Amino acid sequence: MDCVNISWFLITLFAAIATSTMHDGENNNVGKMLQEPTYLQSEMIESIMSRHLESFSLTESDFEDIIFMKPRSKCVKDALKDIIPECMRLGVDSIEPGLQKKAAIQLSICEFENSKVTYPSSCYNMINDNDFDSCIFDIERAPQYWTTFSGYYREITKICYEESLPFEKEQIISLYSNITKLYSKMFQDLNDSYKDSTHIQQMMKNEFKELQRMMKVILDQNEKTSEEVKEKYEEFSEQYSSMLSTSLEISKKFSLGTENLVEDMANNIKYLDFELSRISIAIEDLDFETKLTDMKNSVLDDVRNLSDESISLLDSILTNLESLDILSQDAQNITNGISQSLKKNEVLSNNMNNALIETDTQLHEHNEVIRFEFEETISYLSQFSDQAIDNAIRDTSEEITKHVATFIDSINLRLEETTTKLEEVIYNIDDLSDKVGNASSYLIEGLNLLTSNGIMDALLLTYNNVASGLESGFGMLTTLKSDIFKIVRFITACILFAILFIWSMNRLFSQNRTKHTTLSSISPIGILNFRRIFRFLTNLALWLSVMGGTLLAVIVTNFLIQLKVYISKLSTND
């Protein structure tokens, strides 16, 4: 009964410890679940285990002493081992004569051996019934042997009564001895499992601390990189906003200057028309038709040359515009890539947070599984069955091993996924940096294209050729050349710069006007406004043609005025 009480006490103790530990684990987070027991708790648990191990050792020694306190010899036990169970099972009256005869012969031989009396050789090594019959036949010949045999044969029933209780006691002692040894082994295994679980718990705690530290470092680096990219993008947007504002101001100033120039040219055309009408009336009687025809042909040749050079210049401008369109598309693609990279970084951050939450959930489930398995183990132990206890211990070990392996595999999988996602974040950050660098290079290339000297040199060459042709044909534009050249060069440069810059900015920001708050208040030019600008440029080209014709008219008028003065001088001299 002491063994039973000790066993129940141990089971109750372990159930209380397991329930308390699991209850504390449910009320704490992942970090507290992995927290090792305090020093006082460890000392208390070790003290309890050592005390009960000593109790088991003392109980085992007591059982050994009880087993060694045998009232009879081994020979007597062997002689009665077959008849006592039958006597207890069926009763004294149901003992078979053959079994009773065998027991009486064996008891007689035990007495002969204890008394060191020689007995017949046929009674040695008896195996089957014939051997026993031969032994009885030889014993019957000697009266002293037969007296001993017959006495034991008659006393079998009495011996059965006397030996039933000691036999039952031995069976009970053997049973409880086996149970005590089993519980001792189970307790030792539980003690070893507790030590192993403490070691594993400490290892898992260290690994989770290292994982937490690594995740914190990675998140800090990611946040720092995101801030740097955000600052660079804001600076880039501010520069674009400033350039766009400057281009809008230049466009407004150019529009006002163009309107004033058109008004002045209209007034000059009206004045020239009036003067030409007067001059045409004055020279009707003069014979200058041949000279005027030559002058007209020369002027037409110069105009054709100017037209050819203008066409080639327009082709060059269209080529540059196509290049600028390609650069604008590349800048647009880079901007889209930057936006997609930022979205990917956000998705990866959300996935990392979800992975941490799933890890927390799996730890909680792992704790629940351990508690459930421990409760199942306790329920099996309460049945006092050797087979049930062995099966429970084996199943519990397999389940715990399986769940621990599954949990470790899950952690390794989460670590691999986290590593892959971190590599993707680093790759996206590098790609983002390359795209920002490409965007800066494209911007610089576009600005260099806008300020390229090739277009300006072509315009200067065209107007120099026109001016030199007019000057060589008439010799009357020395004073007018420099002023007209400066005005036309300034107007042309402003027009080309405004057209190229506004067109490129429209292509770059037409689909990304809501990407940043700095640009949210600036509306793109749009297709309709671009058509208006193109229509304006067409009218401007027509106006330039009119201006060329007007310039030609001014030259002709100047020539006619000088001719009139010359004729007047000749008339005065005559």
From Swiss-Prot:
Topology relative to the membrane: Multi-pass membrane protein
Disulfide bonds: none
Main localisation: endoplasmic reticulum
GO cellular component: endoplasmic reticulum membrane; nuclear membrane
Pfam families: Tht1 (PF04163)
Signal peptide (UniProt feature, chain positions): 1-20
Transmembrane segments: 484-504, 541-561
Cell location: Endoplasmic reticulum membrane; Nucleus membrane
One GO term (biological process): nuclear membrane fusion involved in karyogamy
Cytoplasmic membrane side: 505-540
Ranges per topology, Lumenal: 21-483, 562-574
Keyword Cell membrane assigned: no
Keywords carried by this UniProt record: Endoplasmic reticulum, Glycoprotein, Karyogamy, Membrane, Nucleus, Signal, Transmembrane, Transmembrane helix
UniProt keyword annotation of Membrane present: yes
Glycosylation sites: N178, N191, N305, N333, N438
Family (UniProt): Belongs to the KAR5 family.
Function of the molecule: Required for nuclear membrane fusion during karyogamy.
Protein name: Nuclear fusion protein KAR5
Source organism of the structure: Debaryomyces hansenii (strain ATCC 36239 / CBS 767 / BCRC 21394 / JCM 1990 / NBRC 0083 / IGC 2968)
GN (gene name): KAR5
